[in-house]
Amino acid sequence: MLLFSLFIAFIWIPTIKRERIPFHVNFLAIFKALMTTILMSIVLAAGVAAILSSVDFLLFSIDYRVTLQALNIIGFLFATIYFLSLVPNYSQENPEVLARASEVPRFLEVLLVFIIIPIVAIYTFVLAAYVAINIGGDFWTNNLLEPLLVSYAIIVTVVYLLVCTIQHKYSELFQKIFPKIMLAVVLFQTVASVLRIQDYGITHGRYYVILFGIFSTITAIIFSFYQKNKSGLIAPILIVLSLISVAPFVNAFTVSRHSQENIQKISFHSLNYLT
């Protein structure tokens, strides 16, 4: 979680005092740099592995550790340096740098507008149908519900940040409608989590689900009722919640341990195992 907090801070800090660089623009720039780095690293790793395998098979034997070390260098050294080289330098607020940061490649634009957004819309319909058909009874304590709702909130948040710079009617509809749908979904998830806590206590996994529910609720409100240039407000909130989850006395494992101990004590007392 500390590394995750540092990564979010890495995206957020350059946008704090720069009105021309909102959070969603830098998020898009970092996303493009990350995807490009992953693609380049995979291609390079595949090429190096193929060359070493060919040498081992056709010419002379090569220790398998050579391949592992080569992949290690590509994955950690090359990928890190290449990723940092793609991160925009906003120190001088060069217009060309700002333009490149906010530019959405045609491939990514088509992928988001004509593939990702329709898929999210269909997934929303399926999720709503599942809730409408099965609501009531054991529905609220179903193990399947929490992962579905959490994954939906993550997808909507990421897609929203990526499509903010795209001028298209589908993108604009997504920005207007889906944050409000996400707010309703998060409320469902919060109710489901609270009901499961009453039966099973707090586990470390459910602790993170609750924290994510808090974050998603605030995020949905910001996306729904604030301008998209205010999207950076979600970054410090996410960082604070992430740090809380690893802080002494209130971290996930401490809270879940105390909760499970209390559940066991209550169960033992009800069965007269403890006097």
Where are these regions (language model features)?
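Hydrophobic alpha-helical transmembrane segments in multi-pass integral membrane proteins
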Residues: 46-53, 123-128, 184-197, 247-258
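Membrane-interface helix-loop-helix junctions at boundaries between adjacent transmembrane segments
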Residues: 1-110
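Membrane-interfacial loop-to-transmembrane alpha-helix junctions, especially the N-terminal start
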Residues: 25, 29-42, 108-116, 142-148, ...
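Membrane-interface segments at or immediately adjacent to transmembrane helices
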Residues: 247-275
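Membrane-helix interface and helix-disruption motif detector
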Residues: 1, 57-71, 130-148, 193-208
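Generic alpha-helical transmembrane segments
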Residues: 2-11, 78-80, 146-160, 182-188, ...
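Internal/C-terminal transmembrane anchor helices
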Residues: 229-252
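Membrane-embedded alpha-helical segments of integral membrane proteins
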Residues: 154, 174-226
